[in-house]
Amino acid sequence: MTLRSISVGHVALDLMFQIDAFPDHPTKKHADAFFQGVGGMAANSAVALSRLGAKAAFYGPVGEDTATSTFLQHFRRLGVDTRHVTPLHGQTNSISAIVTDASGERMIYSHKGSALQQPGPFDPTCLEHQDVVLADPRCVIWAEQAMKLARQRGLPCLLDGEVSPAADLQRLVPLSQWVAFSDPGLQAFHPGPHADGLASALDSDPGVELAVVTLGGEGLLWQVRGQAAQRLAGFKVPHVVDTTGAGDTFHGALAFAWAQGQSPLGALRFASAAAALKCTRPHGILGAPHQDEVRSFLATQLV
């Protein structure tokens, strides 16, 4: 049966520029390539899930400007359900400028739209008939309501622990079942050693079962409630082209594998492989892999 997922949170208009190298001083810089796309953590995770074969939905606050039509066309083209998305009168959307160098590393400059700050009422029917829920912290009110409902209904719920105000993460982490932090996100939640931060997340509420922090090329550190923290090395790929969307691909793939019943280690390996493959492809989340590509890649790995 096809997995059904919903990603609740942020969508943004992405303006992506490719350059050879980042300058070391303020200057004008020629871009070798330009691409306009759609990003945002929840939006990207929905696309990643759709490409893996899930029946994916996105639900997040959007404004009334022209970017909304771009968002809806993007989701429609990539098979993501947006039936619950309604533009908010008088509000604006988020926009990001993403600059990627020849090594695949990137800088992101973002402006948060007013729709995230004044999202209107949350529609609880968006969680009906879902198998797994993802939430990001950009619209705290909606993330909180989505995760509370998921817990009440016994739905697996994954929080994207991206860097955010500490108060927001401290409000949301205890509502998650699994939480996947970026390194800066974990430091915002609990400054100090990674292992202490993961332990703090697990201690925040008995319902939190797994906490993980992704560390780029160094892999990740993860911990299941009642067990010691463990390291998982990152997968090596021949050439990194674009890391934009790799974290969101990881989150979508982690939710996909988890909801399908894989063990925590199996789900983390699947997600790590998906993120590694995404890094070999350009154009942000459009480079997220299909399920058969991830499984073929994993079959070539020794461990």
Q: Which residues does each PLM region occupy?
A:
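Thr-Gly-centered strand-to-loop micro-motif
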Residues: 32, 39, 61, 135-137, ...
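Hydrophobic packing within well-folded, soluble alpha/beta domains
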Residues: 49, 58, 75, 97, ...
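Conserved phosphate-binding/catalytic region of the ribokinase-like
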Residues: 1-6, 29-30, 194-303
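Short, basic and Ser/Thr-rich N-terminal targeting/leader segments
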Residues: 52, 91-94, 216
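Glycine-rich phosphate-binding loop at the start of an alpha helix
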Residues: 39-44, 144, 261, 265, ...
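Glycine-rich phosphate/adenosyl-contacting loop at the front of the ribokinase-like
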Residues: 1-61, 66-70, 77, 240
